[in-house]
């Protein structure tokens, strides 16, 4: 009798619309809650997945409010165990956190050229540091038993998680691909242990 080789099936999900999104602010570690629209987005996605018969074994989320609330809504609807991991927080964008575009341009002007090692907002992380952090969290998932995992997080760190799985490295001045995770956008990844290969099996850019 044939057996299915073990695999990790991982869904990377960005949070619903936050107050920071609605006000067009740089969020980073600034802790904005969901808007009513964001809560509706999370509820609608949970209902969609439930109707599709989609099953997860475990959920992991950033503890920042916008991700926490999204994860709690979905975990409650799908009866999922949920843990919070601070290493799944968004990019630390330093002095830019919470500022709108105009405020950031005045207080923390962007350098003319950014290497992968340039810190955001003068005191924050670089994209390279975020890439390494994402790689550690992806490895943490693979260190767990094969199964179906949901990760609820943020657009920046999820892009770096995708980079890690697809063998892409950050480039200077944001060259390279960008995965457009809209609010409640998600990517489904599969890691085959027999071949040590990752596959992107589905992408939905959300709202």
Give the positions of each predicted feature:
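Extreme N-terminal starter segment of soluble prokaryotic enzymes
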Residues: 4-11, 58
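Conserved histidine-centered catalytic loops in small-molecule metabolism enzymes
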Residues: 52-87, 109, 188-207
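Short beta-strand scaffold positions
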Residues: 61-62, 132, 152-153
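Active-site-proximal alpha-helix that buttresses catalytic centers in soluble enzyme cores
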Residues: 14-81
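Phosphate-handling substructures
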Residues: 76-136, 190
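Glycine-rich phosphate-binding loop signature in dinucleotide/nucleotide-binding domains
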Residues: 52-55, 141-147
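Generic beta-sheet signal
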Residues: 10, 147-156
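Domain-level recognition of soluble alpha/beta enzyme cores
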Residues: 169-197
């Amino acid at each position: 009798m044939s057996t299915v080789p073990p695999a990790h099936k991982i869904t990377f999900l960005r949070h619903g619309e936050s107050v920071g999104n609605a006000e067009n602010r740089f969020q980073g570690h600034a802790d904005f809650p969901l808007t009513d629209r964001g809560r509706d987005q999370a509820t609608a996605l949970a209902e969609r997945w439930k109707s599709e018969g989609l099953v997860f074994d475990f959920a992991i989320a950033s503890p920042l409010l916008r991700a926490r609330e999204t994860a709690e809504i979905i975990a409650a609807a799908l009866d999922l165990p949920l843990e919070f991991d601070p290493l799944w927080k968004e990019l630390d964008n330093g002095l830019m956190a919470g500022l709108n575009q105009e405020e950031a341009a005045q207080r923390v002007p962007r350098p003319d050229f950014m290497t992968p090692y340039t810190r955001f907002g003068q005191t924050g992380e670089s994209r390279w540091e975020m890439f390494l952090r994402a790689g550690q969290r992806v490895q943490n998932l693979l260190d767990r038993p094969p199964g179906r995992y949901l990760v609820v997080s943020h657009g920046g760190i999820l892009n770096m998680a995708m980079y890690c799985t697809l063998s892409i490295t950050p480039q200077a001045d944001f060259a390279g691909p960008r995965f457009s995770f809209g609010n409640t956008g998600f990517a489904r990844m599969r890691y085959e242990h027999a071949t040590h290969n990752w596959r992107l099996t589905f992408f939905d850019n959300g709202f």
